[in-house]
């Protein structure tokens, strides 16, 4: 059984001293945090640091010579637990395969990163971009050209992230 002290039975002087001490304690805590550096960021104007392992917007990469990396092995499509990736491939004259259609439904994607880990040529990656809000759901259906465009925009950042995290893949 928990006993509560009944402060109403204390003398007025004791209550006054107790209240003053509690006020001083509260002011001490307030003053202690007042002079510490702020932890709140003013988001649209200030952005916090991102981990190099952050999983954001998807991108398809190209080689330095301009040829797309994707070899249409469809491992990313097979491993995707949300079944958000759709690939159609076509064989080239030289016998290699390339994608004709590469779609990702970003409304289904759970950003697990399995597609990135399964890809043998680092073609599909999740980049550092997290600001891709849209007004309609249709804009979140990424096709091959949108994914290649993302790869062009974020190539330097993606390359740096892959180099830093190569030991984990």
Swiss-Prot record:
Binds 2 [4Fe-4S] clusters per subunit. The keyword Lipid biosynthesis does not apply. InterPro entries: 4Fe4S_Fe-S-bd, 4Fe4S_Fe_S_CS, NADH_quinone_OxRdtase_chainI. Residues 61-90, 100-129 form the 4Fe-4S ferredoxin-type domain. [4Fe-4S] cluster 2 binds at residues 80, 109, 112, 115. It comes from the Bacteria. One of its GO terms (molecular function) is 4 iron, 4 sulfur cluster binding. NDH-1 is composed of 14 different subunits. Subunits NuoA, H, J, K, L, M, N constitute the membrane sector of the complex. NDH-1 shuttles electrons from NADH, via FMN and iron-sulfur (Fe-S) centers, to quinones in the respiratory chain. The immediate electron acceptor for the enzyme in this species is believed to be ubiquinone. Couples the redox reaction to proton translocation (for every two electrons transferred, four hydrogen ions are translocated across the cytoplasmic membrane), and thus conserves the redox energy in a proton gradient. This is NADH-quinone oxidoreductase subunit I. The lineage of its organism: Bacteria, Pseudomonadati, Pseudomonadota, Alphaproteobacteria, Rickettsiales. The gene is nuoI.
């Amino acid at each position: 059984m928990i006993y509560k002290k009944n402060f109403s039975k204390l003398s007025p002087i004791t209550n006054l001293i107790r209240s003053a001490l509690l006020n001083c304690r509260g002011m001490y805590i307030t003053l202690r945090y007042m002079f510490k550096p702020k932890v709140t960021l003013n988001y649209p104007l200030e952005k916090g640091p991102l981990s190099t392992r952050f999983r954001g917007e998807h991108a398809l990469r190209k080689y330095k010579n301009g040829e797309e990396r994707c070899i249409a092995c469809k491992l990313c499509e097979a491993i995707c637990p949300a079944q958000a990736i759709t690939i159609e491939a076509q064989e080239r004259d030289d016998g290699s395969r390339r994608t004709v259609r590469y779609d990702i439904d970003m409304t289904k994607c759970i950003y697990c990163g399995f597609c990135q880990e399964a890809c043998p040529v680092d073609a599909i990656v999740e980049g550092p971009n997290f600001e891709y809000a849209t007004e309609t759901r249709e804009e979140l259906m990424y096709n091959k050209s949108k994914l290649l465009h993302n790869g062009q925009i974020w190539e330097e950042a993606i390359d740096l992230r892959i180099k830093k995290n190569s030991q984990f893949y």
